[in-house]
Amino acid sequence: MTNQQDYTQDNDKLYRYLFQHRAVRGEWVRLNKTFTDTLNTHQYPKAVQDLLGEMMVATNLLTATLKFAGNITVQIQGDGPLRLALVNGNDQQQIRALARVDGNITENMSLHNMIGKGVLVITIAPKEGERYQGVISLDKPTITECLEDYFVRSEQLQTQLIIRTGEYEGKPVAAGMLLQIMPDGSGTPEDFEHLTTLAATVKDEELFGLPAEELLYRLYHEETVNLYPAQDVQFFCGCSAERSSSALLLISDEEIDEILAEHKGRIDMQCECCGTHYFFNKEAIEKLKSTRV
């Protein structure tokens, strides 16, 4: 078995695993630097940080179930002090997240009080083929419970999600597990209940501080678990000067000139996700205008 002191080897990793004698599949993910990189450029309230961590882990686990190249967006929109929380991840486990806050959010504020009247929207976008979008009612106390209900309703698959956020050794961390009965119909409710009962005993410090192999052994030492190679997880925004230029081209020349005059001849565009600044002076703007068709 892996030594507990080596837990960092599985930081920012996602694992898939199967049970040899039970038709249930599993996933495990832990976000360390990925989560920290997401929070570093924002001063989100603690409750929003925790919610984003929960959504990021859920998105990683969801994208790991994809059988095609593409991405998944998990988005909350509401009329409460948390106007928007959005996470986007792809099949390469590249992920980004952002939130928009308009009002006071206390540390222990509930999901419903943060969001008010709102919905959870999941968008699945294959690189090839049609997009699928599902709208989920936020009628459960947590996003995790709402997503479990989504799996049962949309895919008719029994699914357990265990997601925790917090700190480990003084640093933010978010981690989670997914258990799902196999879609081929060979799994039994009894097998699923047995494994989910064991998974529910997991402690925060185990999710945050153990390598995947050791954690699974502690939970399922009487089972034969086939653990597949890890996939790296990383924060990846995807913004660029080119994309900022394209956004400017959506504005009329007159509006651009007004912005230039107001900001002393320089436009500063900041990425809402990662905080990167893109600057355009008058010369760059004139060159950009000349590219209009």
From Swiss-Prot:
CDD domains the record matches = Hsp33
Per the record, its GO cellular-component terms are:
cytoplasm
Regarding how it is modified after translation, the entry says:
Under oxidizing conditions two disulfide bonds are formed involving the reactive cysteines. Under reducing conditions zinc is bound to the reactive cysteines and the protein is inactive.
Q: Which GO terms describe its molecular function?
A: protein folding chaperone; unfolded protein binding
- Write out the similarity annotation: Belongs to the HSP33 family.
PANTHER family xrefs: 33 KDA CHAPERONIN (PTHR30111:SF1)
Q: What is this protein called?
A: 33 kDa chaperonin
Q: What species is given as this protein's source?
A: Haemophilus influenzae (strain ATCC 51907 / DSM 11121 / KW20 / Rd)
